[in-house]
A protein has these predicted regions:
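Short helix-capping and inter-helix turn/linker motifs at the boundaries of alpha-helical repeat units
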Residues: 13-18
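C-terminal alpha-helical interaction modules of replication/initiation AAA+ assemblies
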Residues: 2-10, 22-25, 29, 35-169
Length: 169
C-alpha cells in the first residue's frame, strides 16, 4: 500500500539543508530536548566540515544561554509561556527595564526577543538548575576543545547528552 501523506521526516530526508539551517535546527532540537535529533544534526554539521568550536559557539551556547535567561525571567516574573516566539517581546515590555538590562542585544541595541521567545516556548522542558549546569558544561567543553587532544565529536556529543538527557530523580 502506498501512502499519500508526506511527513516532516520525509522532507528532512529528501531536502538538503544549508549549514545555517542545520545550526538553527540543532538549537531547536536542544530546546525541544530531542537527544536523537540533536546528535544526528551534530553529526551532519561535522560531516559538512563545521568546526566543533564553531558549533559550540554558534548553536549550543546561545541556545542554552537563551533557555536559561528565558526560564529565569519566566520564573522570577511569573511569565506565561508564549504561543509564538514573537509574542514574548510584548511580554518583556511589561516587566521593569532593569529586569531585562542583562539580556543579549541585537546590533541596533534592542533585545533579541525572537530567540528568547523560542527559548521561552521550550523553557518548561528544563529546570533552572539543569540549565545552569548546562552552561557550565558548555564552558568545560570549550576548554576541552581548545586545550586538549580529545576527539571533538566525542566532546560535543557528551555535552549534548549532558544538556538534553533527563536527570533521574
Amino acid at each position: 500500500p502506498q501512502r499519500r501523506e508526506v511527513s516532516a521526516d520525509d522532507v528532512r530526508l529528501l531536502v538538503p539543508m544549508s549549514r545555517a539551517g542545520i545550526v538553527f535546527d540543532l538549537g531547536n532540537a536542544l530546546a525541544e530536548r530531542n537527544l536523537n535529533r540533536a546528535l544526528a544534526l551534530l553529526d551532519q554539521l561535522l560531516f559538512q566540515g563545521e568546526t566543533a568550536i564553531g558549533i559550540l559557539i554558534v548553536a549550543i551556547i546561545p541556545t542554552v544561554r537563551n533557555l536559561l535567561l528565558a526560564k529565569d525571567l519566566m520564573t522570577r516574573h511569573r511569565l506565561q509561556r508564549p504561543a509564538q516566539p514573537f509574542f514574548f517581546g510584548k511580554t518583556l515590555e511589561r516587566i521593569p527595564a532593569e529586569a531585562t538590562a542583562h539580556l543579549p542585544r541585537k546590533k541596533d541595541g534592542t533585545v533579541n526577543t525572537y530567540s528568547l521567545g523560542i527559548a521561552a516556548i521550550h523553557a518548561h522542558r528544563y529546570e533552572l538548575s539543569e540549565l545552569r549546569a548546562g552552561l557550565e558544561a558548555c564552558l568545560a567543553a570549550n576548554i576541552q576543545l581548545v586545550t586538549t587532544q580529545l576527539d571533538h565529536e566525542v566532546v560535543l556529543s557528551q555535552l549534548i547528552v549532558r544538556i538534553v538527557a533527563k536527570r533521574e530523580g
